[in-house]
Amino acid sequence: MKRVLLLLLAVVCGHALERGRDYEKDKVCKELSTLGKDDFRTLSLVLYSRKFPSGTFDQVMKLVKEVVSLTEDCCTEDADPGCYDNRTSALSATSCESDSPFPVHPGTAECCTKEGLGRKLCMAALKHPPQEFPTYVEPANDEICEAFRQDPMEFADKFLYEYSSNYGQAPLPILVSYTKSYLSMVGTCCTSASPTVCFLKERLQIKHLSLLTTLSNRVCSQYAAYGKEKSRRSHLIKLAQKAPTAALKEVLPLAEDITNILSKCCESTSEDCMAKELPEHTVKICDTLSTKNPKFEECCQEKTPMDIFVCTYFMPAAQPPEPANVELPTSKDVCDSKNINVMDQYTFELSRKTHIPEVFLSKVLEPTLKSLSECCHSADSTACLNAKGPVLKKEVSSFIDKGQELCAGYSENTFTEYKKKLSQQLRAKLPEATSAELAELVEKHSDFASKCCSINSPPNYCDSEIDAEIKNLPEP
């Protein structure tokens, strides 16, 4: 499977590697022969659905059909030697046409300014940002079976497209394994004498794989949005907030461990990478943090490692042990090459003492830490930090205050209670507002809070939304 997936990734846009087109073509043809047309087509559909999540079903299917066709045609013994290269070149040319039948990527136009191999490599490298809000909703059992009985192949194709485009950040082997298991369940239960009983039994069998798929999609989406270093900081912030009585030396290795796991597993073609690494990580969490917060202790009583990880992942932040009054590090500390953890220490202290969602802290820490580091490259680092320090501290404090105002009460109440209290607060602030205006404001603020005021809020979406919401806050 590992080699197959790697080669299919190469096929996506005729990705001829430096070792040569003939070498690549031979590999692809061998895998087509090994897999067979149907499995090759299925994997291609999963890959393109992930790669082009904004493409329509018809667009993705046309691309799949074309790639499978050219691979079949060019892999026959009597195929023209230039068949593979010519057909993949024609495929990339068609992708550049204004009325292209294939899915479009925002970066396609730039790739189309290149020619030949450069264009193919450019298109092969295109990636969509993570789908931070999956919209796939599984139909009811009777709807599933009705669609399956009408056309089993079309049902399978549409499911593969919809699920893969929504959960495309899950590691490819996990995504393939789950979708294959799901379709097997549908085929079994929709031909069963007791479909309802069958679905209950089969869903229980694939529950672990389903959970692994959706959760790995979520953590890998955040990793893709942040990148390795920001992801590391993000996990440090979350752990500091969940275990504010722990020490940096206890939470930093855990933040680095989960970041390394995501770095290794999110793009891995190994079928058991995530399934093997996450349980080992949960053991480290429980060994280190179960005495730091009763909620960690509760989570560590769950039956399976995956259940433990889910419990700790969704655990809310604890109440800070003391009010936030964190001093910026000095120029001596910041610029001392031996003091490698000074930025982490500042991040840790600010996070554990601040009751504000991680996306807010990550957003304000990025420019703050960058400004501190820049002082080390100035002619007089001490003077630089003395000048910037008070301004940075004021900006951080102001941003945190605004973030706390935007998310006040969200994590402490049910959503219904939160909206009720929000309505009362807005009514007190805006006594002249009409009922309709008030209702609109409540919906707007509560929608923002539901997406950006939790500990695992999506960074890409919330980055711009936070700016917009803060801009609309009245000046004190």
From Swiss-Prot:
Q: What family is it from?
A: Belongs to the ALB/AFP/VDB family.
GO CC terms, sorted: blood microparticle; cytoplasm
Q: Which domain of life is it from?
A: Eukaryota
Residues folding into a coiled coil are none
Under the subunit heading, UniProt states: Associates with membrane-bound immunoglobulin on the surface of B-lymphocytes and with IgG Fc receptor on the membranes of T-lymphocytes. Interacts with LRP2; the interaction is required for renal uptake of GC in complex with 25-hydroxyvitamin D3.
Residue intervals of the Albumin domain? 17-208, 209-394, 395-476
- Origin organism of this chain? Oryctolagus cuniculus
So which residues have sugars stuck on them?
N86
Give a yes or no for keyword NAD in this entry. Answer: no
Gene for this protein? GC
Q: What is this protein called?
A: Vitamin D-binding protein
Question: Does Glycoprotein appear among the keywords?
Answer: yes
Keyword annotations: Actin-binding, Disulfide bond, Glycoprotein, Repeat, Secreted, Signal, Transport, Vitamin D
Q: Which InterPro entries match?
A: ALB/AFP/VDB, Serum_albumin-like, Serum_albumin_CS, Serum_albumin_N, VitD-bd, VitD-bind_III
**Record GO terms (molecular function):** actin binding; vitamin D binding; vitamin transmembrane transporter activity
What does the function comment of this entry state? Involved in vitamin D transport and storage, scavenging of extracellular G-actin, enhancement of the chemotactic activity of C5 alpha for neutrophils in inflammation and macrophage activation.
Q: PANTHER family under this entry?
A: SERUM ALBUMIN-RELATED (PTHR11385), VITAMIN D-BINDING PROTEIN (PTHR11385:SF11)
Where in the sequence is the signal peptide annotated? Answer: 1-16
Disulfide bond sites: C29-C75, C74-C83, C96-C112, C111-C122, C145-C190, C189-C198, C220-C266, C265-C273, C286-C300, C299-C311, C335-C376, C375-C384, C407-C453, C452-C462
